Amino acid sequence: MTKKRRNGGRNKSGRGHVTFVRCSNCSRCVAKDKAIKRFTVRNMVESAAIRDISDASVYPEYAIPKLYIKIAYCVSCAIHSHVVRVRSREGRRNRAPPPRVRWKDGKKVNPAVAAAEDAKAAAART
């Protein structure tokens, strides 16, 4: 029978058994190596309230702590919530991570456009 993926959709490769984790969205049991894992860093306080808290704080320059959360999704929830996307047969063979999203002034910046702007700015300085 034909094989859809080289790794069979998991990262086990020779281990007999791996532990299970629960999906953060639907609580489905999914193998730890098959789960789509994401590490999120968020502020404990929403952005609208940060200034109010810093104004009311007794301590100057008080750093509000962040939430560090490791999220694990089952495959169906990850696809449904657009954490990962369905790729073509040729696209599935590409194992390189997708380009990092860059932000500038609160907006997403295309990496190719950002590199061109940096090169143009460097040429203007010389």
Swiss-Prot record:
Entry-linked InterPro entries: Ribosomal_eS26 (IPR000892), Ribosomal_eS26_CS (IPR047864), Ribosomal_eS26_sf (IPR038551)
Annotated region described as Disordered, given as residue ranges: 88-107
Taxonomy, superkingdom: Eukaryota
A Gene Ontology BP annotation from the UniProt entry: translation
Assigned keywords, A-Z: Ribonucleoprotein, Ribosomal protein
Cellular-component GO terms for this entry: cytosolic small ribosomal subunit
Family: Belongs to the eukaryotic ribosomal protein eS26 family.
Protein name: Small ribosomal subunit protein eS26
Organism: Schizophyllum commune
Gene assigned in the entry: RPS26
